[in-house]
């Protein structure tokens, strides 16, 4: 599910084909290892490179890394287990190796030489990933932000123009949100925004994308036609109406949806969905409207 929030930016497991370990492998070129590990800012690629180096020089056929925020895996998950703790940027990490055979004293020394080389490139990659996430996602709701939305909508509309599937856009707005903020304060308002983000997140499908683009305005890019967008609107309105806090504070939502045509640009699709949203508000709010020109 891509809300632009993600969840994780990278998959937990990343397998990388390695050269088979040979007891006659040449000595480790530590300078070359450093260069290889610094070649990427993708944590999974850095970790896969680390695993490949280990597999070439030591009887290691798999390694996993785990911290509070990261899980990375390379190679096989069976063998003789060896667990080690390292500190990366002040964060404790657990490395669990899967060995073909127990390490000899010289092999243990080799591992101790290679292991510290992982820390700085992995820390760089993790920090870059975190900055990328912050640049793409709304801090309050965890949904995509305006910048991520703009790029995603252009890409989605381009696919529709190439006849690679239907794309619709839903524009959502909270009813009575300003009154809530004025009466109960911004802390309460932030709580409602976060809860609404959770409602959207739990309502959309894995192929849809949700964003908060400002204030109490949200959008959803739907991979489907106007009827698919309508079903999603129904789920969101129903979930909002049955949410205790929304009922308590007198907040509801209005939605408008439109489907992209082969000749429509991204901004035109937004304008059509936004126009339909205001038709929903004019109809009494707490409802949704679909672009009438696209219903058949």
Swiss-Prot record:
| Single GO molecular function | metal ion binding
UniProt enzyme class:
transferase
Annotated Gene Ontology cellular components are:
plasma membrane
Q: Which CDD domains match?
A: GGDEF
Practical use = Shewanella oneidensis MR-1 are electrochemically active bacteria (EAB) that form biofilms during growth on electrode surfaces, thereby functioning as effective catalysts for the interconversion between electric and chemical energy. DgcS synthesizes c-di-GMP under medium flow conditions, which activates the formation of biofilms on electrodes via c-di-GMP-dependent signal transduction cascades.
Domain named GGDEF: residues: 165-293
Catalyzed reactions: 2 GTP = 3',3'-c-di-GMP + 2 diphosphate
Indicate yes or no for the key word Metal-binding: yes
Q: What is this protein called?
A: Diguanylate cyclase DgcS
Q: Which organism is it from?
A: Shewanella oneidensis (strain ATCC 700550 / JCM 31522 / CIP 106686 / LMG 19005 / NCIMB 14063 / MR-1)
